[in-house]
């Protein structure tokens, strides 16, 4: 049995197969498979245990360790948040970034007339400041998927990528 201490200012609520972690910046919900992991919340501690089924011992032990690491990162992120920076780089055509609701648009990439667009996942906040794009959120998966979506729409289809290196690139991650 593994136990995790819940930091001050963080709250954990257990439903059937999901654990809701709430902090000062917001909340995130972590789902788990009760076939492999059993979770109990008692006061300011979370107890994790592997399945007693002998056929699933190895798999459930690995699942418990993974879920424990996920919960540690989640409890830190609901308190401090996650921020990533991306940089807008272009050499040929000056592109502009526009955000409308949960949509992210890149206009004039490679001189294209139709803007490229993608979605912003979950409660992630995206801001454009000059040549930098700041992505902030509470859930590390939502922030990561938003970055992946932005990188995916910047792919230069039909162009020599050694020459056409225009796009939005991940600059640094602030923890």
What are these regions (language model features)?
Residues 1-175:
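Ribosome-associated RNA-binding proteins
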């Amino acid at each position: 049995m593994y136990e995790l201490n819940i930091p001050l200012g963080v709250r954990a609520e257990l439903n059937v197969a999901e654990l809701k972690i709430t902090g000062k910046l917001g909340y995130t919900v972590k789902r788990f498979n009760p076939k492999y992991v059993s979770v109990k919340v008692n006061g300011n501690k979370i107890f994790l245990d592997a399945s007693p089924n002998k056929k699933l011992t190895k798999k459930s032990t690995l699942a418990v360790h993974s879920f424990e690491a996920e919960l540690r990162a989640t409890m830190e992120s609901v308190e401090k948040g996650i921020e990533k920076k991306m940089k807008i780089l272009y050499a040929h055509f000056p592109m502009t970034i526009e955000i409308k609701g949960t949509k992210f648009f890149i206009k004039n990439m490679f001189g294209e007339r139709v803007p490229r667009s993608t979605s912003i996942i979950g409660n992630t906040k995206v801001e454009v400041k000059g040549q930098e794009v700041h992505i902030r959120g509470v859930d590390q998966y939502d922030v990561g998927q938003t970055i992946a979506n932005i990188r995916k729409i910047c792919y230069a289809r039909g162009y020599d990528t050694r020459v056409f290196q225009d796009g939005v690139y991940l600059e640094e991650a602030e923890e």
